[in-house]
Design a protein with these regions (language model features):
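Extracellular glycan-recognition regions
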Residues: 1-212
Length: 212
């Protein structure tokens, strides 16, 4: 990461510029749609055109996945939230919803990353494995909320409005689908882009993450 000063003189973190050299391809937005809702919530709906996604779930929660499976990538776009419901991103998830869940509270300025998976031996009470990984605060700003979600090997990073908010290393999920979730909310994403990265091959990985 790189330490810079924002417009008000506050020190902020920006993504390591070296990631630009690792981009392997930029996907055509048409390859990312249509969206797939995987929880079967009857109150959920989604309409997507290349680069723009409209998602809604009036009651309960729904996960909306983009097309394709990815391991190392950078997903970017502008997010708009209608109402006071909850929303966020999911990454490296399977069709059952096991993977990483990133909740975003744009009103309180709170980002939370969790690992979420089914626990077949947990019975009714412990049917899901739920592990908080990291919580971070950020400065609430007016819309649009510009986001960039990066996954490279074990390294995961979220930037909002061009500044790094959350960063950690975790190896529970290494590949899967990417998307969004809405819970009692309407969500719109514009300018959606997806870059894929070359896979880490260094024998020192993930120790090399210390320099990012």
């Amino acid at each position: 990461k790189e330490l810079v000063a924002d417009d008000e003189g506050r020190l902020r973190l920006k993504r390591f510029a070296g990631f630009e050299a690792l981009i392997a391809s930029t996907l055509d937005p048409q390859q990312l749609v249509p969206l797939q809702a995987i929880l079967g919530n009857p109150s959920a709906s989604a309409v997507a055109t290349p680069g723009v996604c409209h998602m809604a779930c009036e009651g309960g929660m729904e996960i909306f996945l983009l097309q394709g499976e990815y391991d190392d990538f950078l997903l970017s776009g502008d997010m708009y939230l209608e109402g006071k419901g909850k929303c966020g991103l999911v990454l490296r998830v399977n069709d059952q919803g096991d993977g990483y869940f990133l909740s975003l509270d744009f009103y309180k300025g709170l980002a939370q990353l969790r690992a979420w998976g089914h626990n077949p031996e947990g019975g009714h009470e412990g049917a899901f494995h739920y592990q908080p990984l990291q919580t971070a605060n950020f400065l609430p700003t007016p819309e649009p909320h510009r986001f960039s979600l990066l996954a490279h090997g074990q390294y995961l990073e979220l930037s909002l409005n061009d500044f790094v908010v959350l960063t950690l290393a975790d190896d529970q999920f290494t590949q899967g689908r990417i998307g969004f979730y809405a819970e009692g909310a309407k969500l719109r994403v514009e300018g959606l882009t997806l870059n894929t990265y070359t896979t880490p091959t260094s024998p020192d990985y993930p120790e090399t993450l210390a320099g990012l």
